[in-house]
Amino acid sequence: MTVQHPDVVIRYIKTKNKTRKLATYRSDDCDLRIKHETINKFISERFIPSVFTKGYVKNRSIYHNAAAHLYNDYYIMMDIKDFFPHICHKQLSEKLFYELNLKQEGQISRKECNDIVEMCSISSRGLPLGFVTSPLLSNIYMKEFDGVFYGKLKKLGLPNVIYTRYADDLTISFKSDSIEKMQTYEDSIVEIATALLSRYGLQLNIKKTRSYNMNISNHVRVTGVNITKQDNGSRRLTVGRSVKNDLYWEALSCVEDRDADKVSHVKGLQSFVLSIEKTGYESCYSPIMMAKVHSYGFDTLKDLIDSL
């Protein structure tokens, strides 16, 4: 789609370091969105996602992305630079054709794949941020990469090596008790990722490459979820104290001001916290903080939020 469709609305979102181009729909029931949702349904019924991807897949989330690495020692996190805008349409169309005909031939033709890619794009390269089809198509684009990359990691002989991808975030972890070898391992992994990504017209954002050693620190953050080491050596997943503090204060503000949007945000935030920590997240609050909750007639913060 090289000419802007009348159902597409372009917005620009400013972040700390850049301005992102966002393609949204004129309305939730416009023709283009309905077509995109039909395409998503057709593809989802025929596509088997990579076992390594934890993003944009049913019953997988940032929780599963972090949990996969829970008991490893050394972590390397890498980021694909400008991932969605650099996806190659020709390669995507070929991969779409291969994946949709994998279980049963004749599901879709090459021309139909080309048409889908064009209909789900707004330029000659890349997938637009904001289209409902972009996440699924990006996983099709990266499925081959995921398998090949993991195979190359296995050949390095790293103990218990684990690889996951959440959209453009790559996480590699393994066990090791040799600090001297860490930099060599990291250099090799970055070199492999760089060379392999280039085949797909992609590159690493080297500035965002990070590594952590749990034998030195007691926590590491993986796609927004903290893996923390307990005093007894066990590990657990947490969202971090700042998120739980935000939940507490925003929930209390909703008791007096029951603004529907604020209440919805608080309930969504609590759902996120519970999805990661499951139970016991309120143990971080001081007796004074919990006394405030009790003063409203509730035993727990969860009870207070559920009542909003």
PLM regions: where:
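Right-hand nucleic-acid polymerase module
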Residues: 1-131, 136, 140-154, 179-308
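Active-site-adjacent structural elements in folded domains
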Residues: 156-158
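Short beta-strand
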Residues: 161-166
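Short beta-strand-to-loop capping motifs
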Residues: 172-177
